[in-house]
A protein has these predicted regions:
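Class I SAM-dependent methyltransferase "Motif I" SAM/SAH-binding loop
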Residues: 57-60
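Conserved SAM/SAH-binding beta-strand->alpha-helix loop
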Residues: 82
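A short acidic, Gly/Pro-enriched loop at the edge of an enzyme's catalytic core
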Residues: 113-122, 127
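A short glycine-rich, Lys/Arg-flanked "PGG" loop and its adjoining helix->strand segment in the class I
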Residues: 142-156
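Conserved beta-strand signature within the Rossmann-like core of class I S-adenosyl-L-methionine
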Residues: 157-164
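Class I S-adenosyl-L-methionine
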Residues: 175-225
């Protein structure tokens, strides 16, 4: 049995994108062109923001919404494959009349390849799908190619925040960032990665982990070359 026989990625996405409400369907249709890959280059023409943050796989958009509301002078970009999450965040963006968020629907790697060199100040990868089965590891967002593109698109001294409650993908991601010569792991001692920064916003998945007495991994990598 080959990989495509064993797992249909399109069916997986379809199952996650079901049950859109009428309002969610309507707002997705309205913003269809603005959240497409073709419109990504338009972001880079925006010059009024001094700090630009990208979140890969923002889920329901809790962090993006929180940050955009609290830091109106920063630009926040989000990429997601989950239509329901995009739609819900679009509704919240309209509700709060936010101008400092840009959203994109699709594959994060495709967007990273489109980004300008030395463009982003930070990249967030918060509790990504761990794809626990070995045959699905190729689906993990962190790999050699994506880390290279992350490095290229980040400014010097830019940072990557990578949080997860899954041990397998924690060490998987750590390995790829450590092996990339551009990044330094911002840590004093190894166990520091199990301590969260109190000021950080607690996401839905982080909250679930903490309620189960699971201490997530909190990684910060700095681009130093």
């Amino acid at each position: 049995m080959n990989y495509s026989d064993d797992f249909n990625f399109n069916n997986y996405l379809s199952s996650r994108n079901r049950s859109l409400t009428k309002d969610q369907k309507s707002i997705l249709d309205f913003y269809q062109k603005k959240i497409s890959l073709e419109s990504f280059c338009e972001i880079e023409k925006i010059e009024e923001y001094n700090y630009i943050s990208l979140e890969i796989g923002f889920g329901t958009g809790d962090i993006l919404l929180h940050n955009a509301l609290n830091f109106p002078n920063n630009l926040f970009i989000g990429i997601e494959y989950y239509k329901k999450g995009i739609a819900q965040l679009l509704l919240n963006i309209e509700k709060h009349n936010l101008k400092n968020i840009r959203l994109f629907y699709g594959d994060a790697f495709a967007y990273l390849k489109q980004a300008k060199t030395n463009y982003l100040d930070e990249i967030l990868i918060m509790f990504p799908d761990p794809w626990p089965k070995k045959r699905h590891w190729k689906r993990r967002i962190i790999n050699n190619n994506s880390v290279n593109e992350i490095s290229r698109s980040l400014k010097l001294n830019g940072k990557v925040l990578f949080y997860t409650d899954d041990k397998s993908i924690a060490f998987w991601g750590l390995r790829y960032f450590i092996l990339n010569k551009s990044f330094t792991w911002a840590i004093n001692k190894p166990l520091d990665c199990r301590k969260r920064t109190p000021s950080n916003y607690i996401t839905k998945y982080e909250s679930k982990a903490l309620k189960k007495n699971i201490d997530p991994y909190y990684f910060c990598f700095i681009k130093e070359q």
